[in-house]
Design a protein with these regions (language model features):
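Sec/Tat signal peptide C-region and signal peptidase I cleavage site
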Residues: 5-9
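Primarily secretory-pathway and cell-envelope proteins
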Residues: 10-112, 155-171
């Protein structure tokens, strides 16, 4: 007699790409993609202009906490462009500051836009799931479970910052 283990219980569910490519999604407990709400970040940096000198400042989101609460292991999905010079939105750790949430940002001399301080970036394991031309539907999974705290997924558009918080699991 030969016993063949079932692989269906061991396989991870991979969602199909949703119709709206502009949103950022998480997978709920019923394996449905739920979109994260966006907030608007502000910064004293003039991100639309070429910086005359390198300066460090911040991106700020109003309010002490995000309204969205996720589990530390919740899976994040989004669409991004796959071509040289483009990077997917960044998953970053936010710190509280006088009733708001902030992340350090840098404007580099001679370049328009901003960069996030590398110490605040949560290094993900990107996993491409579907490709259509230059566009890729991907999963961003942190390398380790997220610690309790405030997080944001930040791309180039400061009016479209997805935020969430992770709270400590109840024992």
């Amino acid at each position: 007699m030969i016993w063949v283990p079932s692989t269906s219980a061991q396989q991870e569910f991979l969602p199909s790409p949703p119709a709206d490519h502009s949103l950022i999604y998480v997978l709920d407990q019923q394996n449905k993609l739920i979109s994260l709400p966006f907030e608007t970040a502000t910064t004293p940096l003039r991100a639309e202009q070429v910086a005359r000198s390198t300066s460090t400042s911040y991106l700020e989101l109003k309010g002490e906490h995000s309204a969205t609460v996720l589990l530390a292991t919740q899976r994040i999905f989004l669409f991004t462009i796959d071509r040289g010079g483009a990077h997917p939105p960044l998953l970053v750790w936010l710190t509280p500051h006088r009733g708001a949430r902030r992340v350090p940002a840098i404007a580099q001399r001679g370049i328009a836009g901003f960069a996030i301080s590398s110490s605040e970036i949560v290094r993900p394991i990107p996993r491409g799931l579907a490709k259509n031309g230059d566009e890729v539907f991907m999963e961003l999974r942190p390398r380790v479970s997220l610690m309790p705290g405030e997080y944001a997924i930040i791309g180039n558009d400061l009016t479209r910052v997805a935020t969430f918080r992770v709270i400590a699991a109840a024992d």
